[in-house]
Amino acid sequence: MSSADDHCALAFQYLDDDRLSDSEACFRRALAADPDHLLARTQLADLLLSLGRWEEAWPLNRVYDGKPRPDAPPVPFPEWRGQSLAGKSILIWPRFGLGDQIMFARYFPILRAMGAQVTLIVLPMFGNVFDGLDCNVVHAADELFIPPQDYWVYSALNPNRLNQSLATVPANLPFLRTTPLVCDLPPGPKVGIAWRGNPVHANDADRTFARSNFQALEGLGAAIIPLDYEVSGATTLAQTADLISKMDLVISVDTSTVHLAGTLNKPCWVLLPKHRTDWRWLRDRSDTPWYPSLKLYRQTARGDWGTVMAQVVADLRAKLAKAM
């Protein structure tokens, strides 16, 4: 391994031990040894983002500025990298997680306010959930026609290109359109649950847990409703959004269900892993600037969902006692 690789490996060890200052220092030493070390740049950026130091983080993530991006979509027009959008058109290309595409849709009005005509490519599994947005919505199909544009951008890169900070996270939540899901729901309080996300996610083993963990919620006085599409019968996120809208509360691991609930302003308790928590949830806080209706429950030890669920059970019992 190179010297930069050695520093990077040590930075990860410190990160896993919550020695954040030491981890940051090692990532910086890796970059001093090799300024183009991709892993050190992106991981230091994630660490800084999780600490709320976004202005320091964004430049580190601009690793392809000034050169072709190897993961660029198959379109003939250039990537948007912060240029003026007055009188321009821009294509939002789908990439990263489903939740990312929901969460970062709040930036489309900013692009429009900058003078852009915005076109959004929507994957089939979203259904019509984005059809109410104030932009051109193109549903992806086998034969996808993309009108000529001035620029393209990944939705998740908009906070970076717009130089966002914690103080400037847009409070406006995008309007989501729902598609009715025919199902029989019991009377009384209803709690929707989601216990798994994308199985190919790099941190899936830590952020997903067994459905049996939710057995602790039974017998508290609320009907427990699975939101997982393989159980609920939903075939699109628009149908899942409809089901969520009928819940009194959602309890979910870190997956797209959280973003649907948050955008619908539905109370949602998010169960977060100790290991490699996503930067968007920041650190050591139970709220989030992204969604006012969310409450965060964090593991205090890697793999310990029992302590998390004990707190969830206590809070749900208290909530039900107040008749939700």
Feature annotation, model-predicted:
Residues 1-324:
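Catalytic machinery of carbohydrate-active enzymes
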